[in-house]
Regions:
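Short, Lys/Arg-enriched, disordered terminal segments
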Residues: 1-2, 298
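ABC transporter nucleotide-binding domains
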Residues: 2-7, 12-203, 208-209
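Residues that cap or initiate secondary-structure elements
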Residues: 18, 31, 55, 229-231, ...
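Short loop/turn segments at beta->alpha junctions
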Residues: 93, 212, 280-283
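C-terminal coupling/interaction segments
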Residues: 249, 255-299
Length: 299
């Protein structure tokens, strides 16, 4: 499968701060790929390198088969880019902005432009400086989708937006997902879970993992064991058991390598036969909270 974005051992240092520490990503064409992690994890730094806004200290990055250091001019006609704090010409109206941008993109679709203006309820004659944060984001996204980009790059697009606006933006993206690769950074896990196909978790510049969201959801389970008498935390247990605790006759933990056959067998090998075993699916937020609290790399 061809990659829309590929990075290899990407490092970025700002004086004494190492914002990225050997980041390697493979973003397949057609994916809705989410780069997630806490604030300060390095997500925006990675995107700025991909968009040739800043240079990497070392390593390499390619976007649509082109080295990111070469992304400029006509290459930008295939990329839609929207960032959280994107600068826009405040004196322009929404209509003037679209009129200004249209000639720069040979693939600009006026029918799609009209459709996006209607879908996002954009006020054509209102100046950008007078728009709410959510409406500004809609205007930025509409101007980045109207030319059918092969790649859509979004840096924290949902920050500070009310739920209705977030839903409208997500729907606008999903309506075009079949023709574009979408690469989005966010710390809003609840939103990401609703539409991403792939996910990568970045923490302090380190990539903790990268995989399909369905695979991640399948391998994480909250486990609860009930015994006939008081239970204790064993000294030795599989490395994939995170946040293990015992209270009275109940043991709880998260298994980050859940397998319907192996996990019960491992439990019996460590504890003997419990009176009851339950395995519950986890939300994306619960998965990342567990990982952060565990402080392990076993995931």
């Amino acid at each position: 499968m061809t990659n829309a974005i590929q990075t290899e051992d990407l490092v970025k240092k700002f004086r004494r701060v190492e914002a990225l520490r050997g980041l390697t990503l493979d973003v397949p064409e057609g994916a809705v790929y989410a780069l997630v992690g806490p604030n300060g994890a390095g997500k925006t730094t990675a995107i700025k390198i991909l968009m040739n806004i800043i240079s990497a200290t070392s390593g390499r990055a390619a976007v649509l088969g082109v080295e990111s250091s070469q992304i400029r001019g006509h290459y930008l006609q295939s990329i839609g880019y929207v960032s959280e704090n994107q600068q826009m010409p405040e004196w322009m109206t929404v209509g003037a902005l679209l009129n200004y941008l249209r000639p720069f993109y040979p693939t600009w679709d006026t029918n799609l432009e009209a459709e996006l203006k209607k879908q996002f309820d954009l006020p054509r004659d209102r100046k950008l400086r007078h728009l709410s944060r959510g409406m500004r984001m809609k205007a930025a996204l509409a101007s980045s989708l109207a030319y059918h980009p092969k790649l859509i790059v979004l840096d924290e697009p949902f920050t500070g937006l009310d739920p209705l606006v977030r839903d409208e933006l997500i729907q606008g993206l999903l309506d075009r997902a079949e023709e574009s690769t979408i690469f989005v950074s966010s710390h809003d896990l609840a939103e990401i879970e609703t539409f991403a196909s792939h996910i990568a978790y970045l923490e302090e510049g380190n990539l903790k993992f990268e995989e399909e969201l369905s695979s991640l959801a399948n391998r994480f389970r909250e486990v609860e064991l009930t015994f006939d008498s008081a239970a204790t935390v064993p000294q030795n247990q599989p490395a994939s058991w995170l946040q293990l605790s015992a209270a009275a006759a109940v043991v709880r933990f998260t298994d980050c390598r859940f397998d319907a056959e192996r996990t019960p067998a491992d439990i019996r090998g460590v504890f003997g036969e419990p009176r009851n075993m339950t395995f519950s699916p986890m939300s994306l937020r619960s998965i990342f909270l567990t990982m952060a609290k565990s402080g392990r790399n076993s995931a």
